[in-house]
Amino acid sequence: MRRQGPATLRGKAIPKTTTDQRLLDRRGPSDWVHADPWRVLRIQAEFVEGFGLLAELGPAVSVFGSARTARGTTEYERAERIGAGLASAGYAVITGGGPGIMEAANKGAVSANGVSVGLGIELPVEMGLNDYVEIGLEFRYFFVRKTVFIKYSQAFVVLPGGFGTLDELFEALTLVQTGKITRFPIVLVGSDYWSGLFSWIADALLGSGKIAAADPQLVRIADDPAEVVRIIVDAHRSGPLAGSG
């Protein structure tokens, strides 16, 4: 029998080398850096870096949407106006740091002399952080990145996007629905884009009893950037902000 930290190993489960040997023997294989215990340390390091970087950020709103949205389009300009409006209202603007909607929101924040944050993600196709990110961090793991989005945001603004945008939207909806975060406005921008999805939610999910009657009301849908900002400001005016740590 051998004790290995808090674990007990017996028989063939006992490794042929000690932890110190594997650390100090440079002739050993290098694939240990890809093992799960090492990944735990990398994951921990990402949390520490994210929490440390944004610990003193102050009130912030995350803006999500497609990386494929072209400059000069209505959606891009709307995201830029939302970013500027949020910054003028005293919020830092957090995005995924990429192009499209993310770039537009960061650009708007910078134009209004606000704080512009980008939380990037390692992808097979390198994108990098857009030029309007002033505070940036690149993550390896989606779930760490999503935790940082939630922890340092007081609201989510969601413009038209694809699977990644939907992932972030439903992550927030689940946390609000289950009471893990409170007083956390979720505003969808673009009634034409989102109305079909929420009609399906009302018909299929609510209609079959899979969600509560109040659950579809967890989100607001708006088209005007000024209204988006007003919804968030009004939601926070009467009490403490959710997601502030």
Task: Give a label for each model feature.
Residues 2-20, 25-119:
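Glycine-rich beta-alpha loop segments
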Residues 33-40, 185-186, 190-193:
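Catalytic-core regions of core metabolic enzymes
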Residues 54-56, 85-87, 109-110, 127-131, ...:
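Solvent-exposed alpha-helices and their adjacent loops that cap or buttress functional pockets
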Residues 100-158:
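Acidic/glycine-enriched connector segments
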Residues 123-128, 165, 193-196:
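Short gly/pro/ser/thr-enriched loop/turn and capping motifs at secondary-structure boundaries
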Residues 140-192, 236-241:
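Active-site/ligand-binding-proximal alpha/beta "capping" segment
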Residues 188-245:
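C-terminal functional extensions of proteins
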